[in-house]
Amino acid sequence: MPQTLSASDMVTPGSLSPPPTEPTDGEQAGQPLLDGAPSSASLETLIQHLVPTADYYPEKAYIFTFLLSSRLFIEPRELLARVCHLCIEQQQLDKPVLDKARVRKFGPKLLQLLAEWTETFPRDFQEESTIGHLKDVVGRIAPCDEAYRKRMHQLLQALHQKLAALRQGPEGLVGADKPISYRTKPPASIHRELLGVCSDPYTLAQQLTHVELERLRHIGPEEFVQAFVNKDPLASTKPCFSDKTSNLEAYVKWFNRLCYLVATEICMPAKKKQRAQVIEFFIDVARECFNIGNFNSLMAIISGMNMSPVSRLKKTWAKVRTAKFFILEHQMDPTGNFCNYRTALRGAAHRSLTAHSSREKIVIPFFSLLIKDIYFLNEGCANRLPNGHVNFEKFLELAKQVGEFITWKQVECPFEQDASITHYLYTAPIFSEDGLYLASYESESPENQTEKERWKALRSSILGKT
């Protein structure tokens, strides 16, 4: 089974309507993919597809796909400036006298586009200059209907609230990236362990789901593109995604922390009966995560139990009823590109689409596999074709994968938060890898010369003993 992951581990080197205008510069757009959307076109043509008119509005799928992928070729603030300029130019909004009938048909479409953009990609509007573009273009149509100005005020208010929530972020992982070294096992009477905080597997699975959804909520769709797709070589602008993946990185750290927390909780008890009890508890938690649709926590728990310091505890595992664990391992088996997991994920996705309750809507994918799928999609297809056109067909597939994730992450968690449990999950000390090995050797003595030598080295370096 996979071990814990870092962002570098995840990535190794190696229905739409046409706008009313024709392709520019005499170009011929590629063959349509869906209802008039070109499979490839110049960036200018794709931008034109985004711009509404009095008689045309781009379909929602096109808006999301282009706004997601366009940042590979043009920075969002520049794209917004271009869109606003085209709106002003095409609708003649710079004239002293406006065609009010025409503007009244165009205005709602412009506001709808801006609403969709700010709702889905709020981080594109963090700079004051982008807000200035919004106010300028809406200010030009406001004389035709004061409702436009009111709608703009509501839009900006919602945007500011969204940005404020994103800046606040989820609860931090205190010390998550700095595991402690093993010193000595504290007496059971004073050691605070997870089972002392929560002894019910279903409750812990619910709280893990609460944590997962809270952290997922802060990941913007643009982070997938910014983190895992190379900068377009034909673009003249500087890379626009160097430091814009903090929420994605934090989510990877959370997965790693949960792996190490599981291993730490198993290795900590002094008696094998207690260790076996903890293992069986986590097996039940993992099963409940599977039933809920929380595959990310499920994989983290399985990965933690499969870490070498845990898996070597043969005397402990001999006391564990492992039938349920083997079933879960089979579900998450990487064989066949995780075919068993992918089948289960499709089942959970179907359940979510037909859900009658909020609990049935939950789908939390195994995140690192989602990232790898997106990465290999990018690696397998060029961003541009030999003629310089943008490979829009590729980005439709990218948007399909990211869009599904966005739908899942927007589900409201139906479980009430238990602050004491989530605080423990975030802050409980975890062993480093060396600490886990030492705790494991202290629990069950080394069985071969290699283990004996490692145990001796760890006792010397960590405990100062020979």
Curated annotation (Swiss-Prot):
Annotated segments matching region Disordered: 1-37
GO cellular component: plasma membrane
Keywords (A to Z) from UniProt: Guanine-nucleotide releasing factor
Keyword Cell membrane among UniProt keywords: no
Domain annotation N-terminal Ras-GEF: ranges: 34-164
Name of the encoding gene: RASGEF1C
InterPro entries, sorted: Ras-like_GEF, Ras-like_Gua-exchang_fac_N, Ras_G-nucl-exch_fac_CS, Ras_GEF_dom_sf, RASGEF_cat_dom, RASGEF_cat_dom_sf
SMART domains: RasGEF
Domain of life: Eukaryota
GO molecular function, one term: guanyl-nucleotide exchange factor activity
Pfam family, one: RasGEF
Protein name: Ras-GEF domain-containing family member 1C
BP GO terms, sorted: Ras protein signal transduction
Domain called Ras-GEF: residue spans: 200-446
Role description: Guanine nucleotide exchange factor (GEF).
